Structures are given as structure tokens and as C-alpha cells.
């Protein structure tokens, strides 16, 4: 962990942004798995806000008023993720507020249920 306190003494009123790419305890995946192992969010003590990567699901955590944001991925990466709710985050550095921008996509991973070849011939296949 960088010495944020020392940097604040030296540089004063700057914004201190945490950047992190790995699982954090408490983050969830698209299938509902919650990380119990990983890094504790207390490592961001002293940051003004935190931008994360790794988990492809938009979610926000909070550490003593510090927003910790997982923006999601830009598009669905595999069958374990939903087709929608992918995008990016725009930060207002002064207010420490963010906005999640959802991106629509014409592509995705889908699962179809087909009981017989007739389902395809008669266009009766079902999106699961």
C-alpha cells in the first residue's frame, strides 16, 4: 500500500485515487458468488475515491465515505454474465460522484432450448 498520508502532507489538497484490479472481499459476481477471500477494502484508507477492475458487474462499496466502484466490463464476456448492464463510469473528481453509463450491445452469449429438429424448422426454439 502506498503511503497516502505522507503524500497528503507533501502535496496537500490533491485528489487521491485508488486503482485496483483484483477481487475485493464482499464483491459479487454475476452468478451471485460473494468473495470472502481477497483484499480488504481498508487498504483504500486515505483515498478520495477508488476505481476497480476485475469483476464484470457494476457495484459500489463504501469505506468510511470513500466510494469504491467496480464499473463492470464494456460488454458481456462469457455465459456467466448478463447480456445487459455493461458499460463504464464517469467520475466528477471535484465532487467524488460518479455516473454509470450503460452500453447497449448487439452481441451476446445466449442459451437456447431445442427439444427436436422440428423446433428449429418451425422456429419454436426458446431462449433460456
Regions found by a protein language model. Name each.
Residues 1-128:
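Extended recognition/assembly regions associated with phosphoester-bond processing machinery
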